């Protein structure tokens, strides 16, 4: 409800590719909409430019809403955005949604944990390493030995390599697995600023 009210009061909306038409329809007609959509290998705006837009629009005294798909604080660069706001002295409020790491599985009817089967869960990026520029990051021989549910976000394009590395690391090839894409297209987190 709070997220809905926030969208209805927006003067500037900065939103991603994963924004749903249902949510976008809540924004007032006269709201300035700034599309900053990102997808693998193609960024409309660089992260530094998104940060600059958020700061500039807030400093203009406008009620800015940042609509992000999934969980902005789990591989979503939301931390970088609030860091830019904090450094600029701009107050903000985070209105959390359901993290896609859990919500997508729930929407598919897959328990993240289940008594006597999976008492733990672990979340990893399935994306290419930004540090090295190529290849997956992380110690897959370690991941393969972890108990419980292993969740890889943004890993569809690297699925074959993820599976190979887990099996090479010792994971049983018969381990049950599921692939969920676009599992919760309306699970969003909103950053709202300023909060004066």
Protein language model regions, located:
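Short, flexible loop segments at boundaries between secondary-structure elements
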Residues: 178-188
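Class I SAM-dependent methyltransferase SAM-binding "motif I" and its flanking Rossmann-like core
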Residues: 69-146, 186
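Short, charged/polar "capping" segments at the starts of alpha-helices
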Residues: 20-24, 131, 161, 186-188
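Conserved small/polar residues in nucleotide/adenosyl-binding loops
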Residues: 189-195
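Short, solvent-exposed amphipathic alpha-helical segments in soluble enzyme
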Residues: 2-6, 28-31, 80-84, 110, ...
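Conserved anion/nucleotide-ligand pocket segment
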Residues: 137-176
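Class I S-adenosyl-L-methionine
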Residues: 3-98
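Short hydrophobic/aromatic-enriched beta-strand-loop microsegments
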Residues: 31-38, 91-93, 112-122, 170-179
């Amino acid at each position: 409800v709070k997220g809905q009210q926030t969208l209805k009061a927006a003067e500037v909306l900065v939103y991603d590719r994963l924004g749903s038409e249902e949510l976008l329809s809540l924004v007032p007609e006269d709201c300035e909409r700034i599309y900053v959509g990102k997808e693998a290998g193609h960024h409309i705006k660089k992260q530094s430019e998104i940060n600059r837009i958020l700061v500039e629009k807030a400093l203009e005294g406008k009620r800015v809403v940042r609509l992000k798909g999934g969980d902005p604080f789990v591989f979503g660069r939301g931390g970088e955005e609030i860091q830019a706001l904090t450094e600029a002295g701009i107050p903000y409020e985070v209105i959390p949604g359901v993290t896609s790491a859990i919500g997508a599985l729930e929407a598919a009817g897959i328990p993240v944990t289940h008594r006597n089967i999976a008492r733990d869960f672990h979340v990893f990026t399935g994306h290419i390493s930004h540090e090295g520029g190529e290849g997956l990051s992380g110690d897959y021989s370690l991941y393969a030995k972890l108990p419980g549910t292993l969740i890889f976000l943004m890993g569809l394009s690297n699925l074959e390599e993820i599976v190979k590395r887990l099996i090479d690391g010792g994971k049983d090839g018969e381990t049950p697995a599921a692939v969920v894409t676009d599992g919760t297209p309306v699970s969003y987190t909103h950053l709202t600023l300023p909060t004066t």
